[in-house]
Amino acid sequence: QEDLLKQNMMSSLLEKETLLREIHHRVKNNMQIIASLLRLTDFQSGNPEVHDVIRDCRNRIFSMASIHEKLYQTDDLAQVPLGSYIRDIGNRIILEFEMEDGQIHFRVDENQPVFVDISTGIPIGLMMNELITNSIKHAFPDTGNGTIQVQIGRDRDGQSGMIRYHDSGRGLPDGFDPDNQTTLGVELIRNLTTQIQGTVTFESGSGMTCTLTFPLKKTPDSHDTVIGEET
């Protein structure tokens, strides 16, 4: 009877895992359908301003869809590697902007592997989307060429995760104060940082640097650290 109970429990867990995997797959597909509809609207409009707005919306959608795709592909369905996730987002944005090969050098360096759950991954993905988009649009106005580097790690005590984003562009405008900015991108970054109980700072000098810190939690499984809410 005990063996039968264990067998039933395993069967139930497998069914739930299959269902969760299917949910992530369907959410990703539905988001891609929305992005495709936006692209169709873009083609029909022929308006450059509409094109820019729709492209930015599509990139935000893809940043959210990407984490569902990665969760669908993982074994535990709960967390994704942050470095790989950000790398996918950056490469997708550069592709959407139709940059020439090698025009923007984008790299992600991981001091330590860090994993995120979906509740933290989506806000981080959206923030990275805004930063990369802003760099491509505004940081390199003269030549369109530049470097974007993302460094991922933890603080010394291992209690907080850190993302250091840097572009080699012209830097922040004089008098830039993120707390008083009303642009959509800065407001999104500010609100999403609050959502994950993090902090964000901006610096100018040899380009622009944005540093994001956020709380980590320990997990008993094979991954050393996962970022997200306690469950």
Role assignments for model-derived ranges:
Residues 38-52, 75-76:
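Short acidic helix/loop segment immediately C-terminal to the autophosphorylated histidine
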Residues 151, 164-166, 208-218:
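Short C-terminal beta-strand
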Residues 145-158:
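Short beta-strand/loop element within the Bergerat-fold HATPase_c
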Residues 8-20, 24, 46, 77-80, ...:
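Conserved short strand/loop->alpha-helix "switch" segment adjacent to the catalytic nucleotide/phosphoryl-transfer site
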Residues 1-13, 17-20, 24, 31, ...:
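Amphipathic, heptad-repeat alpha-helical coiled-coil "signal-transmission/dimerization" linkers
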